[in-house]
């Protein structure tokens, strides 16, 4: 009897397993052959699922985003208030700090390579739009300005780790953002859900 393969699940497994290789070597230097070797598959198998390294990487970013969304949704499902959801997000960010640092460095490497090659991938816009549309649902806010601010603030915290200064006290930043959001909501007559 022939082996039944769930191709979508297998493709996603290949993607998530490739993250560590990209994080270790960087986007620019990794080849399809190295990816195949690291995954323990033939280059033919890899090309069956992904026509190029760029496609592997773009689909990896989209899969990581999907998994991150599931993770944060799970983390926040019991939180009943906006401030509780913000604090839960900070807990997740702190717990997976190294992962988000690797992700930021990879994204920067990919963007640099794209710019060098005169290309412009749409993957970042798709991911940004997906996250921007999800935040109101996850956090219970319906304010585009606040949504963008929270996204920028979190990105800034991650980039502090990229700088390597180890000077960010996440607890004090969590307290500050909660205070700022509370004041913003009060000033604009918005409800904390």
Predicted regions and their residues:
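Amphipathic alpha-helical packing segments from all-alpha helical-bundle domains
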Residues: 114-148, 175-182
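N-terminal intrinsically disordered/low-complexity leader segments
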Residues: 1-9, 189-193
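Amphipathic alpha-helical segments used for helix-helix packing
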Residues: 94-118
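Hydrophobic alpha-helical connector segments
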Residues: 59, 63, 72-99, 147-150, ...
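Amphipathic, non-transmembrane alpha-helical scaffold segments
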Residues: 11, 15, 61, 65, ...
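Amphipathic C-terminal alpha-helical segment
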Residues: 95-99, 113, 150-171, 183-191
């Amino acid at each position: 009897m022939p082996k039944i393969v769930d191709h979508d699940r297998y493709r996603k497994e290949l993607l998530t397993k490739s993250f560590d290789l990209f994080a270790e070597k960087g986007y620019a230097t990794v080849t399809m052959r190295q990816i195949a070797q690291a995954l323990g598959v033939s280059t033919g198998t890899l090309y069956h699922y992904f026509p190029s390294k760029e496609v592997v990487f773009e689909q990896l970013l989209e899969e990581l985003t999907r998994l991150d969304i599931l993770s944060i949704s799970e983390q926040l499902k019991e939180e009943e208030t906006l401030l509780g959801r913000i604090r839960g997000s900070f807990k997740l960010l702190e717990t997976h700090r190294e992962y988000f640092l690797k992700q930021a460095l990879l994204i920067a490497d990919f963007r640099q390579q794209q710019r060098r090659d005169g290309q412009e991938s749409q993957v970042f816009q798709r991911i940004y739009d997906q996250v921007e549309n999800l935040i109101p649902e996850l956090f219970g806010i319906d304010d585009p300005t606040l949504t963008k601010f929270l996204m920028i603030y979190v990105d800034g915290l991650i980039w502090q780790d990229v700088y390597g200064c180890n000077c960010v006290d996440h607890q004090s930043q969590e307290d500050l953002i909660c205070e700022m959001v509370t004041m913003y909501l009060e000033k604009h007559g918005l409800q904390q859900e």
